[in-house]
Amino acid sequence: MGIVCPVGNNVSDAWKNIINGVSGITPIDNIDTELQAVKFGGAVKDFDVSKYLSPKEAKKMDVFIHYGMAAGIQAFEDSGLEVTESNAERIGVAIGAGIGGLSTIEKTADLFREKGPKRISPFFVPSSIINMVSGNMSIKYGLKGPNFAIVTACTTGTHNIGDASRIIEYGDADVMIAGGTEMSSTNCGLGGFAAARALSTRNDDPETASRPWDVDRDGFVLGDGAGVVVLEEYEHAKKRGARIYGELSGYGMSSDAYHMTLPSEGGEGAARCMRNAMRNAKINEDQLDYINAHGTSTPAGDIAETDAAKLALGAHSKNIVMSSTKSMTGHLLGAAGGIEAVFTALAIRDQIAPPTINIFNQDPNCDLDYAANEAREMKIDHAISNSFGFGGTNGSILISKGP
């Protein structure tokens, strides 16, 4: 597995900070925020792209590709895979982004207005389009299996992982490198989400701005980074002695068919999605132990996900823990499902549920167990990671304790 995110640039550091409830939310300093309504976010800190790419390579890529490549390289190295002429066509890549090269697009648009089309870089298009993380990973390692990138807003990472698992299940690959990446803390990214009134405006206290299920939550916090996992057919992994973090046992999808940005009333769409994941995993509701929630800290979204859990799990919803790591990382949009798949797998490995920090006054309409402000040691055999996106696109992966 590999990760680059606001609380750490590798799996070990990020997980340690998540379990200890460390916030990665800080004032934004990569752009001038003087005219912005929101001046903070979940930035990646102390990232050194030269650890992963040469200056020549990095120059041809937007920052979202830098993050995706870094997480992908970490995951590939962690897997211990060796690519040979005989297995290359059985290894593929599915790493997406919700928005893609927004920074490069903004800068190129400014350059076009100032100096005309002849000054546009020949690398503008390949440096900014979303599928180039998968493309560059394939080129770097000579991976000749399926090579694609799903784009579904904030569900992107989860859909790439889930669909990659289906590729393996269908027999089209033995191994898939999958996840999501994003770098949208740009002038238009920050300004656009603020204009939609989706973001917290708690500029005076960034660290507590992301407060899922708290009665005073006022929107999500924009974050950047990438999360990538290596999926492998079990017998194939077992034969080569691979380290197995867990089993991706279920995958569910659904559509709200309701509104461009709001969740369906009562969480009905999200509930169907979770039910589909459990059905695919062949487990009953009462076998689920933990949910890594979408949990974005929006007024409508947090209630809808609480209602969805109740609808999907019935009375058992009172027995599970559902926490939001976005309280520490912010919302990484297309990368959210990637980093949260990593956190969910580690929760199962270490038998501990990450906390939801910043719950100071729990909303009475959100009445489940959210592991408020402190990690919870507990039995976790089966866990769901949820992602829900604009357009009513929903995805849930179900990870189970490995054989």
Each model region followed by its residue ranges:
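ACP-dependent fatty acid/polyketide chain-elongation machinery
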Residues: 1-57, 79, 235-245, 342-356, ...
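Conserved small-residue
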Residues: 18, 72, 93, 137, ...
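Condensing-enzyme catalytic core mediating Claisen C-C bond formation in acyl metabolism
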Residues: 22-26, 204-281, 289-290, 359
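Conserved catalytic cysteine-centered active-site region
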Residues: 26-70, 76, 100-163, 172, ...
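Acyl-CoA/ACP chain-elongation machinery
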Residues: 29, 172-218, 251-265, 295-302, ...
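Feature captures the FAD/FMN-dependent oxidoreductase FAD-binding
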Residues: 65-97
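Short, well-ordered amphipathic alpha-helical segments that serve as non-catalytic structural scaffolds
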Residues: 68-79, 133, 160, 232-233, ...
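Flexible, low-complexity linker/loop segments at domain and module junctions
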Residues: 85-88, 281-287, 315-318, 367-403
